């Protein structure tokens, strides 16, 4: 597969997250992927890390694979998952991405999959919208 063909198959999505104690009510639908319940946890004084949550529904007939995230307000943006090992909750970086099965939903929530925004570059204000770029492998 040529580099051009590979790049062509990757879909970049810009999703706006809102910081608040409730979820952002807007639903965004692009290429058979539906994004809803967007939220970034509130950031307190001098805090340099926070997490984000959302629901991604794949309405396509093919599985989709979320392979990369980037934001303009943190040095690193990573996918993480919480697991229990020997009765201890552990958070792990998911470096190979996440598959969203065809015609199913993946819910990012506390205690499960979530997005980590690491080394925040600026204070995040409540009710402001922030850009996060999602890169998918197929997008339908």
Language-model segment annotations:
Residues 2-11:
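Bacterial N-terminal signal peptides that target proteins for export
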Residues 26-140:
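Compact, glycine-rich, soluble single-domain proteins
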């Amino acid at each position: 597969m040529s580099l051009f063909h590979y790049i062509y198959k990757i879909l970049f999505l810009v999703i706006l997250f809102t910081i608040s104690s409730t979820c952002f009510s807007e639903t965004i639908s692009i290429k058979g992927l539906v994004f809803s319940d967007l939220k970034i946890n509130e950031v307190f004084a001098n805090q340099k890390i926070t997490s984000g949550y959302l629901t991604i529904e794949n309405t396509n007939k093919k599985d989709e694979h979320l392979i990369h995230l980037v934001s303009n307000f943190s040095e690193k943006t990573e996918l993480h998952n919480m697991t229990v090992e020997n009765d201890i909750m552990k958070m792990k970086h998911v470096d190979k991405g996440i598959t969203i099965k065809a015609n199913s939903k993946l819910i990012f929530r506390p205690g499960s999959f979530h997005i980590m925004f690491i080394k925040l570059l600026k204070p995040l204000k409540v009710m402001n919208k922030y850009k996060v770029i999602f890169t998918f492998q197929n997008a339908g």
